[in-house]
Curated annotation (Swiss-Prot):
It comes from Leptospira interrogans serogroup Icterohaemorrhagiae serovar Lai (strain 56601). This is Sulfate/thiosulfate import ATP-binding protein CysA. It holds the Pfam family CysA_C_terminal. The gene is cysA. Keywords: ATP-binding, Cell inner membrane, Cell membrane, Membrane, Nucleotide-binding, Sulfate transport, Translocase, Transport. One of its GO terms (cellular component) is ATP-binding cassette (ABC) transporter complex. The lineage of its organism: Bacteria, Pseudomonadati, Spirochaetota, Spirochaetia, Leptospirales. Part of the ABC transporter complex CysAWTP involved in sulfate/thiosulfate import. Responsible for energy coupling to the transport system. It comes from the Bacteria. The complex is composed of two ATP-binding proteins (CysA), two transmembrane proteins (CysT and CysW) and a solute-binding protein (CysP). Residues 3-237 form the ABC transporter domain.
Length: 356
């Protein structure tokens, strides 16, 4: 048993940040809370930590209700985005702080504290930095020290609020890979907030996608990305092209293309939207009858391994994006201004509307 929240409600004035939300975090898993700004992810994390009080609902740790306990008594380690290290203390003193401020009857001996701190420094691969000050460390190193300090008190759960948000892209990628390896080593039940879709999909065992204080989908990275529950999840998790059309009798007409949509076989004459990832937009030199849409190449941009191509549909004038790998692009020898034809490798059709 890990963390369970039941029917949580949290309001700030007239704004409902958490709206009757329930969630299970299994023991030993690393779970990401992901969503747009204002979706409630940080508020949910702070309620779990005891830094915010819910207006309604329960927070349960390993089968025991902890809603009335303050943050200090919940046994959680919390890592903030901006490190929150004590500048006047050495790295050793920062990590030891949570142990040294315990009341005397619960405080470990100095030798035990020293061994614990040095063990954690080794765990975060900074054992030679124990006598330095935070100002002498890089941002990535400071965040690893903040994590070591959170682990020093031997928490039952680890909570992280956008732990890599203040770091540059390269360091952020290195640290999230490191966090995944660390979690696999210590297996502490962990929940982290992120606004970075790639980060959530790379690091976590499960992703919780929130919108307007409610959960839209919970699943493994593969489940939420490749089998999105609704149009909001599909649109939120990466770039997408939208194709408007109508559903009738198990088929959807999207401009000049008709696609089979048996999942909507009972719907008659309803507006629909087809969702296609850029890498599922295939570019052809010659048309294929009833399967392609003519388009003009507007812009070509290489990102190194891949090439992004903006195209304008000749039937509607709308702009869409295709993504090719470099070898595909070279074989087609495309140039701006050329007319080509596009078709979809994969498309998902939704009938309901979405908003972000």
């Amino acid at each position: 048993m890990g963390i369970e929240v039941k029917n949580l409600v949290k309001r700030f004035g007239n704004f409902t940040a958490i709206d009757d939300l329930s969630l299970d975090v299994p023991s030993g898993e690393l779970v990401a809370l992901l969503g747009p700004s204002g979706s409630g992810k940080t508020t949910l994390l702070r309620i779990i930590a005891g830094l915010e009080d819910a207006d309604k609902g329960q927070v349960i740790f390993e089968g025991r209700e902890v809603g009335k306990k303050n943050a200090k008594d919940r046994g959680v380690g919390f890592v903030f985005q901006h490190y929150a290290l004590f500048r006047h203390m050495t790295i050793f003193e920062n990590i030891a702080f949570g142990l040294e401020v315990r009341k005397r009857s619960e405080r470990p001996s100095k030798d035990t504290i020293r061994d614990k701190v040095m063990s954690l420094l080794k765990l975060v691969q900074l054992e030679n930095f124990y006598n330095r000050y935070p100002s002498e460390l890089s941002g990535g190193q400071r965040q690893r020290i903040a994590l070591a300090r959170a682990l020093a008190i031997e928490p039952r759960f680890l909570l992280l609020d956008e732990p890599f948000g203040a770091l540059d892209a390269k360091v952020r990628k290195e640290l999230r890979n490191w966090l995944r390896r660390l979690h696999d080593e210590i297996h502490i039940t962990s929940v982290f907030v992120t606004h970075d879709q790639e980060e959530a999909l790379e690091v976590s065992d499960k992703v919780v996608i929130l919108r307007s204080g409610k959960i839209e989908q919970v699943g493994t990275p593969d489940e939420v990305y490749n089998h999105p529950k609704n149009s909001f999840v599909f649109h939120f998790l990466g770039d997408v092209n939208l194709f408007h059309g109508r559903v009738q009798g198990g088929q959807t007409q999207l401009g000049e293309i008709k696609v089979d949509t048996p999942e909507h076989s009972e719907i008659e004459n309803a507006s629909a939207v087809g969702y296609v990832r850029p890498y599922d937009v295939e570019i052809l030199r010659e048309p294929i009858e009833a399967q392609t849409i003519p388009a003009e190449i507007q812009y070509i941009h290489s990102t190194g391994r891949n090439v992004k191509i903006d195209l304008k549909r000749l039937d509607t004038g709308t702009i869409l994006e295709s993504q090719l790998n470099s070898s595909e692009f070279q074989s087609l020898n495309l140039l701006p201004g050329e007319t080509v034809h596009i078709r979809f490798k994969k498309i998902k059709v939704y009938v309901e509307d979405y908003t972000i």
